[in-house]
Curated annotation (Swiss-Prot), chain B:
Its cofactor is Mg(2+). The gene is RAB39B. It is found in: Cell membrane; Cytoplasmic vesicle membrane; Golgi apparatus; Cytoplasmic vesicle, Autophagosome membrane. Interacts (GDP-bound) with C9orf72; C9orf72 in complex with SMCR8 acts as a GEF for RAB39B. Interacts (in GTP-bound form) with PICK1 (via PDZ domain); a PICK1 homodimer may allow simultaneous association of RAB39B and GRIA2 to PICK1 which is involved in GRIA2 trafficking. Interacts with isoform c of RASSF1; the interaction is strong. Interacts with isoform a of RASSF1; the interaction is weak. Interacts with the DLG4/PSD-95. Interacts (GTP-bound) with HOPS complex components VPS39 and VPS41. PANTHER family: DRAB11-RELATED (PTHR47979). This is Ras-related protein Rab-39B. It comes from the Eukaryota.
Amino acid sequence: MASDGARKQFWKRSNSKVPGSIQHVYGAQHPPFDPLLHGTLLKAAPKAPATPVKAKRISTFQEFESNTSDAWDAGEDDDGLLAMAAESLNTDVVMETAHRVLRNHSQRQERRKPQEAPGPEQEPQPSAEPPSVPSGDLRLVKSVSESHTSCPADSAGDTAPLQRSQSLPHSVAAAVGGTSDPSALSSSALSEREASRLDKFKQLLAGPNTDLEELRKLSWSGIPKPVRPMTWKLLSGYLPANVDRRPATLQRKQKEYFAFIEHYYDSRNDDVHQDTYRQIHIDIPRMSPEALILQPKVTEDNYTFAQPGIQMKVKMLEELVSRIDEQVHRHLDQHEVRYLQFAFRWMNNLLMREVPLHCTIRLWDTYQSEPDGFSHFHLYVCAAFLVRWRKEILEERDFQELLLFLQNLPTAHWGNEDISLLLAEAYRLKFAFADAPNHYKK
Amino acid sequence: MEAIWLYQFRLIVIGDSTVGKSCLIRRFTEGRFAQVSDPTVGVDFFSRLVEIEPGKRIKLQIWDTAGQERFRSITRAYYRNSVGGLLLFDITNRRSFQNVHEWLEETKVHVQPYQIVFVLVGHKCDLDTQRQVTRHEAEKLAAAYGMKYIETSARDAINVEKAFTDLTRDIYELVKRGDITIQEGWEGVKSGFVPNVVHSSEEVVKSERRCLC
């Protein structure tokens, strides 16, 4: 070991490669990864906080936007039937459409069965796992590299791991993303409808004043890729409905953003901010770069200590499910599975951890079109999501298998079609199980 | 079909954010290591059987807790029903070691009237060049709290089996001696399946050869 003096100090040595060690990060700007901008900011920031490279920023922001637009690519929009309904989003039409989508889907499922290799969802067995691994089976697992040093008595046949199914479906999703449903409506009809939807969006967005109500209705059933960036900005209130005011507003907001950076960036190494900065520093590499999307507004309750907001929402979900599907509810209760054990993450991460990223994006098209989409409607989506697995849930008769299933739902291959179905069902539930009618403004 | 096991132990894995709790558990239960791991939200659940002696299997149910402070109110609900725990720190992160004491205090408050058998785990021992905590001082701290100390690496699969299996054996001994007893309303230890309940012929044959003490 090192000498006393050295030992006292050795951990203070610079550890530039330690995960989570405090390092200078120059990526806290928008757009990131622009060496020119880095240089300018670095030099300019301490002395001349006000004005460097304005024009540059805008052009590189646009560059950034187009460079990263493929993050929105995965999966084509979307379901034609819902699209038509959205044109006049009144209850009857949507309800009728929801039913039609569900009906249509079950027919497609029927048609699809013979020609398709059984995916995990279609399998008759209640398995959350890849087909190669038998379900419901507890197995002895040996870490590959350690197996010769321990557990000498393992029998050879017992080595298949008890797998969690894809807990991070993003990579898989990226691989399968963009493949459209082969059994969807005839492609020409579909693309025709898509083209006309896209036209409607473009007309609306062109102004001079975008009708936000109309835009919401249109967006409910999914926003076509090319217009999604602008549509999200309008729906989230980031940019104004008036077309002429948009460039100036965008410029102002970006300026504000850079002002925040200049204001707070240097404070990151202050003692009081060490823990926060450390956590951020650790979390950023863990986020998929594709996941850098607009954050919804969330109440403070949700992300403060003890997260009372999130816990309350889990309780609300429980209450809702008990009314929607008493059998599932009782089954979970009987096996001592608590909603907090699986649904906490659903609420905390808005299902982002449960479905592939392109599904989350599609989901958020609708969340931004629904009144209180991210809070209230999300509850119904979660309820629909849980009940979606009722068959599998009811077949599991053991706490452990239930919880493993619910924490690792087999959604890795989900596409927009699945999300559309989920949303249609959620919408139906919202009307059928309304707890208070005034939730449904218009 | 369930395999036969003598006991079921519930374990909890705690420690600062990013010390490698989830990666350690994944290595143990799935036999693999992911370079990038999402932060745990709330509590994740894992399970695995271990064989502590030929024919003697223990079913482990493992609660993987989020290290981040804001999830504490969720995670602390799981102390009470745990019989064993792995308390992790990251040997390349001094602060995570300094927080070991706080973690023990935190559990002490919430586990009563039960107790958790803890092992102190110095994780990421493959990163020895970036070490900020010596083995000696970690052993000293562990001894002061009556814990064993072990250094592990999920990346290189060092001591991962041993950390879990040793803890399991220690708990098993305590159960056998009657120092830990199965109690109504406590999930820490449950007794296993009685062989004749199991219908799989293969399992029954296996168990008949064995002495279930």
